[in-house]
Structure formats: structure tokens, C-alpha cells
């Protein structure tokens, strides 16, 4: 397990492998969330057992690290990989989120027995809908279908861009090998996920929930 939290007046995020939790003002994407007061002396272990292998909690109001448990330890990224797919999408297409793509048959079939939002082959979706499917349903077909369409079928090229952007964001312990997290080669750290989440918060998509 890995836990990366940003605690303050803006948001609190906790992620445990494939379970994605985002709490931000009126946009609440809740699967499993823990929020607690943030201070320089905050120690979660005083209130509950920290079961995550690594954890990293930052007060976004002060940028003070309020809790650190082996935050540089490299662990399997799992569903967290989708955050990098979303980051790459927003970096290149933040002003085009209402553009559409068609779900490829090969992708829909590939992720059929994994976490999905029932986005079927040949159906048309907006980029925005794919992002919401990833956040709300941990939808593998949303990530893979979007990556396939935007890369012109060059999934390896998309993954290469994910790794380039990840390094530009400042991550040092992350490697991405697919767009959704099904591949076991996807690895990250708690501190890297903090950097990625902080980068994502610079995009207005995560600040509003009026468009879907």
C-alpha cells in the first residue's frame, strides 16, 4: 500500500493501490478517505495504525511535511498509474476536454475482466468523461482507450511521454509501463505521488464538477 496526502484548506487525497480517493471542495470522489488535522507535529500513529508500507502527508497551506513513513520506498503503482495518464492528457489537451474519441475494440476486450466503467467498443466519449471514469471507477478501459486514441495506436509512445512528463514533474522513483496500471512494471513512491497530485491540482478540471 501507498498513501500520499495533501492536507490543508484545499484538499486531502489518500490512495491505497487501486483505490483512488479525491476530496476537493464540491468535487468528492470517495472510495476510502481519511482526513485529519495537519500540523508540524501530527503523528497519525497516535490515532490509528498506519498500515501503508509508505506514506507522505503535506500541509498544502504551509508546504510543511507533517508525516513521512518510508516515502521514498518504491512500490507497485497499480491504479495510481492513471494519475500520470490524466496528467499527460491535461498537459497536452487541457483546453480540448470536450473533444471525443471512439473506444477501440481491442482495448475494450483487453480490460474486460478488470476495473471498468462499461465503456464499450465503438462507443464515443469525451476526454472529460474518460477522466471522470478513471477517477470515479478506476476504469482501465478509459485510460487505455484514451491513450490509444490520442497516440494514434502508439501505446509505447504514450508511455514514453508519461515517463518524460513524470521526470519533468520531479519524480525520481517512478517508472510507467502502461496507461492504466495493469502491468506490474508500473512503480512509484509516496513522495512521487505527492508531486504528481500537486501538479494535477494546477488544472481547473479538478476544481469544478459542473461539467461532465
Explain the meaning of each model-derived region.
Residues 1-15, 207-212:
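Single conserved hydrophobic/aromatic residue that forms the stacking wall/gate
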Residues 30-31, 94:
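Hydrophobic alpha-helical membrane context
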Residues 31-38:
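C-terminal segment of classical bacterial N-terminal signal peptides
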Residues 40-191, 200-204:
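Active-site-adjacent loops and short helices of periplasmic peptidoglycan-processing enzymes
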Amino acid at each position: 500500500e501507498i498513501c500520499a496526502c495533501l492536507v490543508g484548506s484545499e484538499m486531502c487525497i489518500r490512495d491505497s493501490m487501486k483505490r483512488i480517493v479525491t476530496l476537493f471542495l464540491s468535487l468528492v470522489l470517495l472510495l476510502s478517505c481519511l482526513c485529519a488535522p495537519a500540523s508540524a507535529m501530527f503523528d497519525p500513529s497516535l490515532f490509528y495504525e498506519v498500515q501503508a508500507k509508505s506514506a507522505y502527508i503535506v500541509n498544502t497551506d504551509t508546504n510543511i511535511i507533517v508525516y513521512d513513513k518510508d516515502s521514498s520506498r518504491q512500490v507497485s503503482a497499480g491504479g495510481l498509474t492513471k494519475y500520470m495518464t490524466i496528467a499527460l492528457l491535461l498537459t497536452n489537451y487541457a483546453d480540448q476536454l470536450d473533444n471525443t474519441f471512439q473506444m477501440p475494440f481491442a482495448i475494450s476486450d483487453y480490460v474486460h475482466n478488470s476495473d471498468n466503467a462499461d465503456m464499450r467498443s465503438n462507443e464515443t466519449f469525451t476526454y472529460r468523461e474518460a477522466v471522470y471514469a478513471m477517477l470515479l471507477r478506476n476504469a482501465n478501459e478509459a485510460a487505455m482507450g484514451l491513450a490509444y486514441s490520442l497516440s494514434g495506436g502508439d501505446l509505447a509512445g504514450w508511455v514514453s511521454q508519461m515517463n518524460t512528463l513524470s521526470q519533468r514533474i520531479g519524480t525520481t522513483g517512478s517508472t510507467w509501463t502502461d496507461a492504466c496500471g495493469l502491468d506490474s512494471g508500473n512503480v512509484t513512491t509516496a513522495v512521487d505521488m505527492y508531486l504528481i497530485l500537486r501538479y494535477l491540482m494546477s488544472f481547473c478540471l479538478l476544481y469544478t464538477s459542473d461539467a461532465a
